[in-house]
Amino acid sequence: MHFTIHNTPGVIHAVRLLCWLVLKLNGWKVINVAPTHGSYLIVAAPHTSNWDFPLGIAMAFHLRLEVYFIGKHTLFKGPAGPIMRWLGGIPLNREASKNFVDTSIEVYTNNENLILAIAPEGTRDSVARWKTGFYHM
């Protein structure tokens, strides 16, 4: 995978400490039940708030998980682009010929020990059902 915060020497330790502090001060208790090796998918649902991302990142760092995520390509434009990639982001253009499932499977099969987080709703809006492509993954 590409260069991320997870493999930036020195920075990762400070970020883990900051994430632990943020979670502790907000009353969160994180229990580690994640696998320690191999590739797997994290289903981040429901994704209904802008706080989902920073809290998810904080939990991943606290648990020492090198998590990657797929996000809408517009999140990766401008000055936010390099930051989102550095945090483990993989852009997805929903209008392109390749769909979400194909892109996810390609990323997943081309990388050993990949932890991929996705929001199956595909939006922060409240929805009655998840997008059906998620079930094929």
Q: Can you describe what each PLM-predicted range is?
A:
Residues 8-9, 14:
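N-terminal membrane topogenic signal
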Residues 14-18, 22, 80-83:
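Hydrophobic alpha-helical segments of integral membrane proteins
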Residues 3-8, 25-137:
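Soluble catalytic domains of membrane acyltransferases
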